[in-house]
Design a protein with these regions (language model features):
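Metal-associated gating/positioning segment near the N- to mid-region
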Residues: 61, 66-67, 73-76, 80, ...
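Hydrophobic, small-residue-rich alpha-helical packing segments that form membrane-like cores
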Residues: 25, 65, 69-70, 74-76, ...
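Active-site neighborhood of phospho(di)ester-bond hydrolases with catalytic His/Asp-centered motifs
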Residues: 28-29, 49-58, 77-80, 112-115, ...
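Active-site metal-binding motif and surrounding structural segment of the metallo-beta-lactamase
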Residues: 33-77
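Active-site environment of divalent metal-dependent phosphoester hydrolases
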Residues: 36, 57-62, 83-86, 118-119, ...
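Conserved beta-strand hairpin/beta-sheet module of binuclear metal-dependent hydrolase folds
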Residues: 1-48, 122-140, 146, 150
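Metallo-beta-lactamase
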Residues: 24, 107, 117-182
Length: 182
């Protein structure tokens, strides 16, 4: 398994490049707008980007998912959770809770983790040749090191009245999903 964390300090935005070296395929999770970084990582490691995942609809930065898909031919795997008003309005592969996608030998399992946003999903990664147990969890803005995402932003920053309490309750319930993880 190949893994590289890509961090944009100016935006405080993290993305991830994961790949199956045996199959020569890779995925990018939450790509930043400047996609050249991922193209270069793929080139340096003899991999083709075939999958693009997003943890949620990003309001705080411009994502590079659509451009990266156009340049590489990769499929976009995006949340199909959240209900009306939280749908992506362009072609993608919709992902629901417990859906699984293989990137070579790497298994990506979807966990619906609403709270920060209603459609938020996390990705549980298992390196199947090495282990039956997951080795990484990509949570987007749902969980941070030592903190959790803010369920109040939709109400405070976007003016979506009545979402703060619902978001906090959803986040509380979502956190309990993690108690079942190894």
């Amino acid at each position: 398994m190949f893994f590289q964390h890509v961090y944009d300090k100016t935006l405080a935005q993290a993305s991830y490049f994961i790949g199956c070296q045996k199959a020569g395929v890779a995925a990018v999770i939450d790509p930043k707008r400047d996609i050249d970084t991922y193209i270069e990582i793929a080139k340096q490691n003899n991999m083709q980007i075939t999958h693009i995942f997003e943890t949620h609809i990003h309001a705080d930065f411009l994502t590079g998912s659509r451009e990266l898909a156009a340049v590489t031919g990769a499929k976009m795997y995006l949340s199909d959770e959240g209900g009306p008003g939280w749908e992506y309005e362009f072609a993608h592969e919709g992902m629901k809770h417990n859906a699984e996608v293989m990137v070579g030998n790497l298994k990506i399992q979807v966990l619906h983790t609403p709270g920060h946003t209603p459609e938020s999903i996390s990705f549980l990664l298992t390196d199947t040749p090495a282990s039956k147990e997951p080795v990484m969890l990509f949570t987007g803005d749902f969980v941070f090191v030592g903190d959790i995402g803010r369920p109040d932003l939709l109400e405070k920053a976007a003016g979506m009245v009545g979402t703060q309490e619902k978001g906090a309750e959803a986040m509380y319930n979502s956190i309990h999903l993690f108690s079942d993880l190894p």
